[in-house]
Amino acid sequence: MTISAQRRPGSPNFQSGETIMKVSRYLIGAGLAALIVAIDGAEALAQQLDTVTVTAQRREQAVTDVPIAITVLEGQTLNELSIATLDDLQLTVPNFQVTQTGIGTQMFIRGVGTGNDPAFEQSVAQFIDGVSYGRAQLIRAPFFDLERVEVLRGPQSVLFGKNTVAGALSLITAAPTRETTGYVTATWMPEFGDRQVDAAVSGPLSEQLMGRLAVRYYETDGFVSNPNKGRDEPSREQFAIRGSLLFEPNDRFDATLKLEHNRFDSRGREIEVVRDVNTQTLPNGVPLTFANALTGAGLPGAITNSEFNFTRDADSDEFADNTLFNATLTANYDLGFGTLTSVTGYLDYSRDELADLDFTNYFILTGLLSEDYDQFTQEVRVVSRQDQRLRWIAGGFYQSSTLTNNDITGFGPDITNLGFAPLANVGLERRYKTDSTAFALFGELTYDLTDRLRLIGGLRWTTEDKDATRQIAATTNPLGFDAPLVTDPVVLATIQAGLGVELNNPGGGSGHDLSQSRSESRLTPSVTVEFDATDDVMIFASYKEGFKGGGFDVRGNRTAFFEFADETVRTYEAGLRSDLMAGRAQFNATAYFSQYSNLQISQFDGTIGFNVGNAGKTEISGFDIDGRIALTNELSLAAGVSYLDFEYTDFRRGNCAFQETPDGDIVDGVQLCDYTGRRGRFTPEWTGFARLSYDRPVTDTIDFSSVLNVAYTGSHNIHDNLDPLGNVDGYTMVDLRAGFGTERWEVALLARNLLDEKVLTFAANVPFASSVGANTQYAVPLRPRVVGVQASLRF
């Protein structure tokens, strides 16, 4: 695997769209031909596929009746593939990427996602049991004991809300049952010390009351070596517990209460310096890399490794401690003409984190973070009966939330060697708080124009108010809050002139004590036409609008970048859903074209801050194809492929990559770079997967089962500022699970990343390296190959 922008000698140019199209057409054609041959010989032996039921449109439907580009993974599939996080999930969902960054987590669908700023709400909204989880940090939470996962591509604003401009991720947890059931599953992967236990028990507590209790414990030793600390990183520990009660006094009313607590902690991070490019040579002939510059400045061994080899330099005692509590109450009442549903949700999380931000073996720069978030939501909706010509949904939604984010950029004593002696042992403390209140009314009508032709129209009105404050001040403690303010004018001048930070210290000049409010209201419509071409094939076309609210920047250092605008999208889709071969196969396809305005962007400024803004215009287009087929009673295949074309059509405020000539707009005295005509990061042209499942009896009581999953991601850029050196080659991830078992027990072997691909998912520049003329970059790798064993007991 290479992260160079240059081709390897003799290799095809897989960054050429024309070549990719030719290769892909050949592969798709060959695959279809092989599939047809297999179908022809196995059709008589194959059984029907199970019906997959989803709630993507706030009502139960077969997945083939939903006019949305959707990928569904049921609980059994999640268990078979050992999917426990969103990092795992992306390997089975085309056009879906998840990555850790230096200071957060990002999620993208069709190349659209959310940047690093904690103030951003997610363009790919995450829902658990119908409750929005709108903060980036919540992506890191483990998910467990699930009934299914639904990944919806494209805006879903009418029924899911304002922050679904790219799509929605809906997780549905397993519900209490009337029969007593349970399981215990233990997984061990010795390569990196992975140990995981999942358990659940469910059953009746009385005639009208059922309960379920599920737990997850996980720990790992890490997969990136840190010689300075003498350990592997990141070591992780997770514990989660969920209790559910289902009350059904009669056949017209039910209520489900779910309480969940999560704790997920880590020590160290999976970040390493992967390149230290010299652009000059010193008079003595030594290449001017950042490592050599640090050595010359009296910091020998600051960077001992600058290649991608799962080895990192860091001296800080890094940690990340996260706790999450959520409560959800869902009640349904049969009104006769429809069903009244109330979903009440409360969640609270806290995060404390210390990160090494200089990526060296010295104390130059650290980041200390303390974040708290609480949210209350209430949705009430009525869904009409579905056995009538005119069907409808109507409802209202309310949300209130508070985000508090305090952080310190700490300058250690070793920054003196870089020529910033006044900053030694100084902390740059930033305090941020935002309060948000949102209210929405929504409705959707479905009318049967004929027995085969349907018209669906939806509309959502949303209003939101936000109030935010931010202060930045220099203090006398680089690793602690509430320290005395710096009064030395030399220190203040160094921070403002050398780092471009506007301060609130006495004599600091700018008075960086911001307080602003914003209010916005939006109508987001959708129109869909469905036509049943046959009893088994449905064709549809749709137009949808969506928006994500604006807000106020957390991590910026200058007052001019405090507020950012809302993000909007218009999307056109057309596709088909089909059941084929008497229920033994399904084929789905969706083509799309989207126009985004004001995509919210956060980019590293090269020193210690991030600039937040909006990309003027962006266009994306492509298609998503997926299907399933039961080849025989024992063998089944699921596969999908997605193509994405992404272009900034008007974006003149991008951060410049290393030594890139500024040619964009001038903002607050700084000229930026013109990204117009470029692809965004995390936008591979081609992604796809194929999953082969094979199950057969070995004896009268013992069965053999296996799952092989192959996922492909095409070449794309992963750099925060679109540096060409951040281009990564396409890669293929192969996972395998095979085991023996009965209805009561199972033992299986697991292999993740079987081909041992070396993959980087995010890259950015090391702070201060550009000041000496070095293009030094750090990156986040995926784990290399792991093999393990899993044992389960069921009752």
Residue spans for each PLM region:
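C-terminal beta-signal and adjacent terminal beta-strands/loops
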Residues: 711-719, 740-795
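Structural signature of Gram-negative outer-membrane beta-barrels, strongest in the C-terminal barrel
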Residues: 246-250, 382-385, 397, 434-594, ...
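Outer-membrane beta-barrel proteins
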Residues: 187-196, 206, 218-250, 254, ...
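Periplasmic-side early beta-strands and strand-to-turn transitions of outer-membrane beta-barrels
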Residues: 170, 178-179, 187, 200-300, ...
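Gram-negative outer-membrane beta-barrel transporters
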Residues: 393, 451, 455, 588, ...
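Membrane-embedded beta-barrel scaffold of Gram-negative outer-membrane proteins
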Residues: 328-335, 339-355, 532-548, 563-630, ...
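Acidic, small-polar-rich N-terminal luminal/periplasmic segments of exported/outer-membrane proteins
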Residues: 17, 47-179, 574
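Outer-membrane beta-barrel translocator/receptor signature
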Residues: 122-123, 135, 144-153, 158-241, ...
